[in-house]
Amino acid sequence: MVRRLTSPRLEFEAAAIYEYPEHLRSFLNDLPTRPGVYLFHGESDTMPLYIGKSVNIRSRVLSHLRTPDEAAMLRQSRRISWICTAGEIGALLLEARLIKEQQPLFNKRLRRNRQLCALQLNEKRVDVVYAKEVDFSRAPNLFGLFANRRAALQALQSIADEQKLCYGLLGLEPLSRGRACFRSALKRCAGACCGKESHEEHALRLRQSLERLRVVCWPWQGAVALKEQHPEMTQYHIIQNWLWLGAVNSLEEATTLIRTPAGFDHDGYKILCKPLLSGNYEITELDPANDQRAS
């Protein structure tokens, strides 16, 4: 019996036996085993083919042989460069910045989202607010970060469905005063619209459901430095209002990066929120007059 190989099997074997192109092998010898960002360059001097990050640059670069698409990228590559960082945080931040700035051909494009929005809870009402109009690093009672208004309303609707909240009271559909909504008759609404549930109970359940999406307000008055260490390197990441301003080698250099941030940075928030609040890193509050306080 002859067994026919399927297409996915053939693709796997092709990638498995593929070797780095001869002209790239000289770069492999010097690849560091440290955290950082690496870049595959093609013919262009200004636009890399691909930008990646890893806690071990050498291991990650050598693993770029797993799919035919990666093999195709390697064939177009002419050289490999890298930038070492003190750890994973620095690698994540630098990768996100470089991808936005240089828009590599093989990376998913990261762009500034001018429609970035969140749900804001005001007493018993929920509004969709935009980062271009509201300072998301300071505004209270913000929940979720969404690419656009439609995504925000879909998230609110999902919460309403899960918790049997009233579409009408949430502003998702018109509601006639004194009359139950249509979903109440279907037992999909707990009845805050018609007195079966108090508005206070409805508001409490809404707040409890939104809590897992809360956007944390920037907890410091100004900029801070997060210290990240590696046996061969120490970096201080300068951050203000969840925006990464850059990295320096000493606190004395930190004031050169302190400035007024240009706006809330979604990627910075996602990368930095957990490590900044975890208590696992040394955080120093920065004062323009060089009065630093470590915490």
From Swiss-Prot:
Keywords: DNA damage, DNA excision, DNA repair, Excision nuclease, Hydrolase, SOS response. One of its GO terms (biological process) is nucleotide-excision repair. The keyword DNA repair applies. SUPFAM superfamilies: GIY-YIG endonuclease. Its EC number is 3.1.25.-. It is an enzyme of class 3 (hydrolase). Gene3D superfamilies: GIY-YIG endonuclease. Transmembrane segments: none annotated. The keyword Glycoprotein does not apply. GO terms for cellular component: excinuclease repair complex. One of its GO terms (molecular function) is nuclease activity. SMART domains: GIYc (SM00465). Residues 33-108 form the GIY-YIG domain. NCBIfam families: PRK10545.1. PANTHER family: EXCINUCLEASE CHO (PTHR30562:SF10), UVRC/OXIDOREDUCTASE (PTHR30562). Incises the DNA at the 3' side of a lesion during nucleotide excision repair. Incises the DNA farther away from the lesion than UvrC. Not able to incise the 5' site of a lesion. When a lesion remains because UvrC is not able to induce the 3' incision, Cho incises the DNA. Then UvrC makes the 5' incision. The combined action of Cho and UvrC broadens the substrate range of nucleotide excision repair. This is Excinuclease cho. It comes from Escherichia coli O157:H7. The gene is cho.
